[in-house]
Amino acid sequence: AYSYVSEYKRLPVYNFGL
């Protein structure tokens, strides 16, 4: 199943605390 959370977790901005 596709999860938008999985996409955000792979993005650099996620590590910034988004």
From Swiss-Prot:
Highest rank taxon of the organism: Eukaryota
Record has Secreted as a keyword: yes
Record keyword Secreted present: yes
Coiled-coil annotated residue ranges, if any: none
GO cellular component: extracellular region
GO biological process, one term: neuropeptide signaling pathway
Protein's cellular compartments: Secreted
Modification type Leucine amide: residues: 18
Family: Belongs to the allatostatin family.
Protein name: Cydiastatin-2
Taxon lineage: Eukaryota, Metazoa, Ecdysozoa, Arthropoda, Hexapoda
